[in-house]
């Protein structure tokens, strides 16, 4: 179920402060965050976030197509190692 429109998008307050601080200074640093639940806003376009996936930080460069989605969508938490092979079948 989608979030109510009257509530607006959720973004952690400290994340907005960090982005505004970088915009004022003009620097292009990576913004380290654990907030996978934050929605990507239009002011985030052009910035690079280091999003924590539970093990390490994954760099996420934000572009216009990502606006409205969550930061956690671009930092996968699970690695797929393939399905188990059938041990009865011998390959020739």
From Swiss-Prot:
GO terms for molecular function: rRNA binding; structural constituent of ribosome. The keyword Transport does not apply. It comes from the Bacteria. Keywords: Ribonucleoprotein, Ribosomal protein, RNA-binding, rRNA-binding. Signal peptide: none annotated. Pfam families: Ribosomal_S19. SUPFAM superfamilies: Ribosomal protein S19 (SSF54570). GO terms for biological process: ribosomal small subunit assembly; translation. One of its GO terms (cellular component) is cytoplasm. Belongs to the universal ribosomal protein uS19 family. NCBIfam families: rpsS_bact (TIGR01050). HAMAP family: Ribosomal_uS19. Protein S19 forms a complex with S13 that binds strongly to the 16S ribosomal RNA. This is Small ribosomal subunit protein uS19. It comes from Rickettsia massiliae (strain Mtu5).
